Each structure stands twice: as structure tokens, then as C-alpha cells.
């Protein structure tokens, strides 16, 4: 199972750059997690690029209007995806204006990380940390305790 994180624009804030690098490095031993950055722009343009880059994947749009999951739910879904041989799961983080309705309608899940609206670079770091936490739980390593 491969996690693909697709995000609009390159992180420019120092904490985001450091957080992205930290969690991508921590995720490496667990297998394939890939971050792909698409060119930033209007919601319409970014949504088209995100949909094209996630073709063939189970899609999860990161959106403030989405469902709130616990870490345990993410772990349970990851187990289910493994059991059903889902090969690629794409998490889509849009531009600052969010996703289009078309993109949301073409996703398997809509996920919110918080009831707060999160700046998209912060959302990227939080998502990577949760994916790392998910992997440690699945592997039985102590990070999550």
C-alpha cells in the first residue's frame, strides 16, 4: 500500500519545511509514502491537477467540511485497504481557496483534520504526522504510546 500526498504549491514557511522533511524521513522505513507538489493557482486549476495526479488512486480530499476521523479510524481504514489490496491512497490538499465541488464529488472520502480551518502548509504537516502515527501503530512501535 502506497500513500501519495498531493499538495498545491511548495511549502515556504520554515516550520512546514522542517515538519515535512522530518515526517517524510520518519515514514521511509515503513514503505512507500510520496509527496508530490502540483503547481499552485486557482481552485479550478489546482483541482484539475490534483485529479489528474491521483488517477487510479483511492482519493481522500482534505477539506474543512469533511468528516473528522480519529487516529484509530485511520488505522482501521488502513488495515481494511490492505486487506482489500488497495494499492494507492492519495490525500489531496488544495490551494488556499480549497477544493472545487467536482473534486470533492470524485473522492472516496472527504477528511477534515480539525473543526478549525487550517493553513494548507500546517495541514500537510499534521497529515504526515498522522500517517507516521498510523504506521507506528500498525507496526507496533512505541511512538504512538
From Swiss-Prot:
Q: GO terms for molecular function, please?
A: rRNA (pseudouridine-N3-)-methyltransferase activity
Q: Which SUPFAM superfamilies match?
A: alpha/beta knot
Q: Pfam families attached here?
A: SPOUT_MTase
Give the CC-aspect GO terms. cytoplasm
Task: Tell me where in or outside the cell this protein is found.
Answer: Cytoplasm
For this UniProt record, the keywords arranged alphabetically read as follows: Cytoplasm, Methyltransferase, rRNA processing, S-adenosyl-L-methionine, Transferase
- The domain of life is Bacteria
Question: What's its EC?
Answer: 2.1.1.177
Q: Which family does it belong to?
A: Belongs to the RNA methyltransferase RlmH family.
Kindly provide the name given to this protein in its UniProt entry.
Ribosomal RNA large subunit methyltransferase H
Task: Provide the gene name from the record.
Answer: rlmH
Amino acid at each position: 500500500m502506497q500513500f501519495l500526498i498531493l499538495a498545491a504549491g511548495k511549502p515556504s514557511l520554515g516550520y512546514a519545511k522542517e515538519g515535512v522533511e522530518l515526517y517524510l524521513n520518519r515514514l521511509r522505513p515503513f514503505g512507500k509514502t510520496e509527496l508530490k507538489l502540483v503547481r499552485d493557482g486557482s481552485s479550478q486549476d489546482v483541482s484539475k491537477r490534483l485529479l489528474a495526479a491521483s488517477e487510479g488512486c483511492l482519493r481522500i480530499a482534505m477539506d474543512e467540511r469533511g468528516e473528522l476521523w480519529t487516529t484509530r479510524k485511520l488505522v482501521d481504514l488502513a488495515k481494511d485497504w490492505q486487506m482489500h489490496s488497495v494499492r494507492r491512497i492519495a490525500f489531496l490538499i488544495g490551494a488556499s481557496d480549497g477544493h472545487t465541488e467536482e473534486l470533492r464529488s470524485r473522492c472516496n472520502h472527504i477528511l477534515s483534520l480539525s473543526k478549525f480551518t487550517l493553513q494548507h502548509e500546517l495541514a500537510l504537516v499534521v497529515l504526515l504526522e498522522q500517517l507516521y502515527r498510523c504506521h507506528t501503530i500498525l507496526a507496533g512501535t512505541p511512538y504512538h504510546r
